[in-house]
Amino acid sequence: MIKLFSLKQQKKEEESAGGTKGSSKKASAAQLRIQKDINELNLPKTCEIEFSDHDDLLNFKLVICPDEGFYKGGKFVFSFKVGQGYPHDPPKVKCETMVYHPNIDLEGNVCLNILREDWKPVLTINSIIYGLQYLFLEPNPEDPLNKEAAEVLQNNRRLFEQNVQRSMRGGYIGSTYFERCLK
């Protein structure tokens, strides 16, 4: 019993000592979970995470550089905004690189089932990263956000590949201009 009391007293003293330096804010559940997710990241060699503010783990960028498939040689940047409802609510993920892709629209919205109806709190940032990487390896024309790209992929894979290459080099597809995104 005395040991328990001394542990409580020690903790109280540590908290009050920390309180004199400035008000210490308790980490939210979302912050604790994102810290755990980041610590347990197992990034593939084609991905890298960038934090503009190392004290803010709730906002970061993911860079994917596919090394195979239609998008090989491209560099695609995604922004992650993790809300206070995480892990019960999925993070908001946007593609900042304009890309000709059936599952990413021209505004950067991403069609990935685990970011919507199939989200579960047991999923992690790592799950999302692998899901995004898979979209570049296997674009899904069955669930498109960019219907025009999906139709071309379904009807003429060669033309789709040419359009992807043209867009990544920097050029027009129809009336839409794509900035160069090759590494």
From Swiss-Prot:
Spell out the Pfam families in the cross-references. UQ_con (PF00179)
PROSITE patterns, per the entry: UBC_1, UBC_2
Example of a GO biological process term:
protein modification process
Family matches, as InterPro entries: Ub_conjugating_enzyme, UBQ-conjugat_E2_core, UBQ-conjugating_AS, UBQ-conjugating_enzyme/RWD
Task: Please tell me which top-level EC class this enzyme sits in.
Answer: transferase
- What EC numbers are recorded for this enzyme? 2.3.2.34
What's a Gene Ontology MF term here?
A: ubiquitin-protein transferase activity
Tell me its family.
Belongs to the ubiquitin-conjugating enzyme family. UBC12 subfamily.
Q: What does this protein do?
A: Accepts the ubiquitin-like protein NEDD8 from the UBA3-NAE1 E1 complex and catalyzes its covalent attachment to other proteins. The specific interaction with the E3 ubiquitin ligase rbx1, but not rbx2, suggests that the rbx1-ube2m complex neddylates specific target proteins, such as cul1, cul2, cul3 and cul4. Involved in cell proliferation.
Any notes on this protein's domains? Answer: Both the N-terminal docking peptide and the catalytic core domain must bind the uba3-nae1 complex simultaneously for optimal transfer of nedd8.
What is this protein identified as? NEDD8-conjugating enzyme Ubc12
Taxon lineage? Eukaryota, Metazoa, Chordata, Craniata, Vertebrata
Gene of origin?
Answer: ube2m
